[in-house]
Design a protein with these regions (language model features):
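Bacterial N-terminal signal peptides that target proteins for export
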Residues: 23-36
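N-terminal signal peptide c-region/cleavage motif recognized by signal peptidases
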Residues: 44-46
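Acidic, small-residue rich beta-repeat scaffolds with periodic aromatic anchors
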Residues: 49-75, 173-289
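Solvent-exposed N-terminal domain segments of exported/luminal and surface proteins
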Residues: 52-109
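Structural signature of eukaryotic scaffold interfaces centered on beta-propeller domains
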Residues: 83-92, 146-158, 244-253
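Acidic/hydrophobic-patterned starts of short beta strands in beta-sheet-rich repeat architectures
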Residues: 91-101, 156-169, 252-259
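Short N-terminal edge-element motif at the start of the domain
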Residues: 95-156
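Short, conserved, GDST-rich strand-edge loop motifs in beta-rich repeat architectures
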Residues: 102-107, 168-178
Length: 289
C-alpha cells in the first residue's frame, strides 16, 4: 500500500518420497513467502518501521493507560502497537498513539481495535482520548496477527492530519493460506479520537490442494516426477490484490477527497472516490472491488 497526493497517478520409491518432501518444503516456503509479502506490503511505504516502539515495558504501560478502568481480559488482547505521533495537533504537545487488537473468545469473524492518543511526562503516559468502535475482519479466523501504528502524515485537510492503524492477518491450514491487510485512519480533534476511514489494502489466497493437483497432473504428462513446474502451479492457484491510497487535490466539505485503486498497471484509471461528509469519509469502508 502506498500513499500520495495526486489525482491519477535413489529408486522410484525413494525418489517419490524425496519429491513429496520437496513439495511440502516448497509449500511451506511459499506460505512463508506469502506472510513476508504481506508484511512487506504493509511496511513498504510507512514511517512506522522506525517509529513503532517494540519495547515491551513501554507497550504495556501504554496499554494499561489505554484500558483505563474498563480493561479487556488479558487473554483477549492479541496485539499492541505504540508510536510517537509527530504530526498531531501542535497545541496538544508531544503526542503518542496506541492501539490494541482485542478479540474475545465469543468472537471469531472480527476483532475490536481500541485506539488512543496519549501524552507523556516524567510520571508516564496519560490518556487524552480513545475509541473502541472500530472492528477489523479476521475471517476465516485470527491466526497470525500483525499490528502497527502508521504515522505517515495523512493530510485529510489543509489543517488536519490523520494517523493510521495497520492490521494484518495470515491464516494457514492444510488446504489453503489466506492473508489480509487493513488500514484504519483516525482523526484527533476537539479532544476526541474518531475512526474516519477503513480500507482493505492487501489480500491473497493460496489453494494448496489445487497446486498439489496441478503438480501431479503435470508430473503425469511428463512421465517423470520432479519435472513439474511448481512455481507455475503456485501462481495458477494464487489470487491476490493490493490497493493504493491517495488524496485528490479536490476537496469536499473542506477535506481532500480520498482515492483507492488497485496497485499496478491493472489499476490505471480505476479508482474509488470517497468524500468527506462532515465527520468521516463516505462510504466509511472500502472492502475491495
Amino acid at each position: 500500500m502506498s500513499i500520495g497526493m495526486q489525482e491519477a497517478r535413489g529408486d522410484d520409491l525413494s525418489f517419490g518420497r524425496r519429491d513429496s518432501r520437496a513439495r511440502r518444503s516448497r509449500k511451506l516456503d511459499f506460505c512463508m513467502q506469502t506472510v513476508l509479502t504481506l508484511v512487506l506490503a504493509l511496511v513498504a511505504h510507512c514511517a512506522f518501521a522506525s517509529s513503532n516502539v517494540t519495547d515491551d515495558e513501554q507497550q504495556q504501560a501504554a496499554l494499561h493507560t489505554l484500558m483505563g478502568t474498563d480493561p479487556a481480559p488479558a487473554d483477549s488482547v492479541k496485539g499492541v502497537a505504540l508510536s510517537p505521533w509527530a504530526h498531531g495537533p501542535s497545541a496538544s504537545g508531544p503526542l503518542w498513539v496506541v492501539a490494541a487488537l482485542v478479540q474475545r473468545p465469543t468472537e471469531t469473524v472480527d476483532a475490536e481495535l481500541w485506539t488512543g492518543v496519549l501524552t507523556r511526562d516524567g510520571h508516564g503516559f496519560r490518556l487524552l482520548a480513545s475509541d473502541r468502535s472500530e472492528r477489523v475482519d479476521t475471517s476465516p479466523m485470527l491466526w497470525s496477527a500483525f499490528l502497527a501504528m502508521d504515522v505517515i502524515p495523512y493530510r485529510i485537510s489543509a489543517q488536519e492530519t490523520a494517523f493510521g492503524v495497520l492490521f494484518g492477518n495470515n491464516y494457514t491450514s492444510t488446504a489453503h493460506s489466506d492473508s489480509t491487510g487493513i488500514l484504519s485512519l483516525y482523526r484527533y480533534r476537539d479532544g476526541r479520537v474518531t475512526p474516519v476511514f477503513s480500507a482493505l489494502t492487501d489480500w491473497s489466497t493460496y489453494d494448496k490442494d489445487g497446486a498439489a493437483e496441478c503438480e501431479e497432473k503435470n508430473d503425469g504428462k511428463r512421465g517423470k516426477p520432479g519435472d513439474a513446474r511448481p512455481d507455475s502451479c503456485d501462481a495458477e492457484n494464487t489470487t491476490e490484490t493490493h490497493y493504493v491510497l491517495s488524496f485528490s487535490p479536490h476537496m469536499t466539505n473542506g477535506h481532500y477527497d480520498l482515492l483507492v485503486r488497485p496497485k499496478g498497471k491493472a489499476g490505471a484509471g480505476k479508482s474509488a472516490r470517497f468524500t468527506w461528509n462532515g465527520n468521516t469519509y463516505q462510504p466509511r469502508r472500502f472492502t475491495g472491488d
